């Protein structure tokens, strides 16, 4: 097969699979939470109002448009792999057994650090205008479809993290797959509009640095705070945490019968 045909085939597969993953995971979450168990889960809804069809159409449109970035970076990563530039390894015992598992939280921390600082800049000029970050903030009452619903200019910046990590950090395909599943799932949960996390989540020593759906909802409501994605570590460190976050969260989580241990 000629090289150009190979890359054309790969590009088509990347765009198709990225689009299907987005539609299946977001639609699946929406179908279960917003439809199938709508009445049972209504007490966990952050904003009692339902997302409008217009808002969800807006999110899906930009969510699919952003897949052009997955196509571009997917082709770049394929080219890097084809030319031996990726740090992938395929034998699990090439590194200590614990490395393949420990690197996952390390990657999550690094990814969140990159996201926090790039996201913070997107709320400042000229980066806000250049990345068209206003597209993502076109909806306040978010839904699962908000995940990855950004202008391609913003998506280009957000996804730049991936090829850099794949070149610099040795990763096994299993580790990489788990990392991608976790990040996508957390993105959907964070934009879901429902708060299922237990009471005490924002103050427990085990989870206080984690993000939540309430955390990100407040960012959409007030764009000057809560810039983290998976974590709120940098927001706590840099003083950009919404001062009402913990109280807001507990008010939404009061219906959850589970409570995490918290400091006295």
Indicate where each model-derived feature is located:
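Juxtamembrane helix-loop-helix connectors linking adjacent transmembrane helices
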Residues: 72-110
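Membrane-helix interface/capping segments
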Residues: 39-47, 77-88, 123-124
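Alpha-helical transmembrane segments and their lipid-water interface positions
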Residues: 25, 29-33, 73-74, 115, ...
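Core segments of transmembrane alpha-helices
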Residues: 65-73, 77, 81-82, 150-166
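Hydrophobic alpha-helical transmembrane segments of multi-pass membrane proteins
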Residues: 12-16, 64, 101, 105-106, ...
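Interfacial helix-start motif at the membrane-water boundary
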Residues: 52-70
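Cytosolic/stromal cytosol-facing helical appendages immediately following the last transmembrane segment
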Residues: 1-26, 34-53, 125-264
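Internal active-site segments that recognize and position negatively charged phosphoryl groups
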Residues: 108-124
């Amino acid at each position: 097969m000629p090289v150009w045909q190979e890359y054309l085939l790969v590009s088509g597969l990347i765009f198709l699979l990225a689009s299907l993953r987005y539609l299946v995971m977001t639609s699946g979450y929406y179908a279960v939470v917003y439809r199938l168990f709508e009445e049972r889960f209504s007490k966990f809804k952050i904003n009692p109002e339902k997302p409008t069809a217009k808002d969800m159409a807006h999110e899906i449109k930009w969510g699919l448009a952003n897949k052009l970035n997955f196509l571009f970076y997917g082709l770049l990563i394929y080219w890097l792999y084809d030319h031996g530039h990726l740090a992938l390894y395929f034998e699990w015992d090439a590194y200590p057994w614990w490395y393949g598992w420990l690197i996952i939280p390390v990657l999550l921390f690094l990814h969140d650090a990159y996201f926090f600082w790039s996201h913070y800049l997107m709320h400042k000029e000229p980066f806000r205008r250049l990345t068209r970050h206003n597209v993502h903030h076109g909806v306040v009452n978010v839904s699962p479809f908000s995940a990855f619903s950004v202008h391609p200019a913003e998506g280009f910046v957000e996804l730049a993290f991936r090829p850099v990590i794949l070149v610099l950090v040795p990763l096994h395909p299993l580790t990489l797959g788990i990392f991608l599943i976790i990040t996508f799932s957390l993105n959907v949960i964070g934009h879901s509009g429902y708060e299922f996390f237990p009471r005490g989540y924002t103050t427990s020593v085990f989870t206080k640095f984690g993000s939540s759906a309430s955390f990100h909802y407040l960012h959409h409501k007030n764009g000057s705070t809560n810039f983290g994605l998976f974590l709120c570590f940098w927001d706590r460190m840099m003083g950009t945490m919404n001062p009402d976050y913990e109280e807001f969260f507990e008010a939404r989580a009061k219906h959850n019968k589970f409570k995490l241990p918290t400091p006295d």
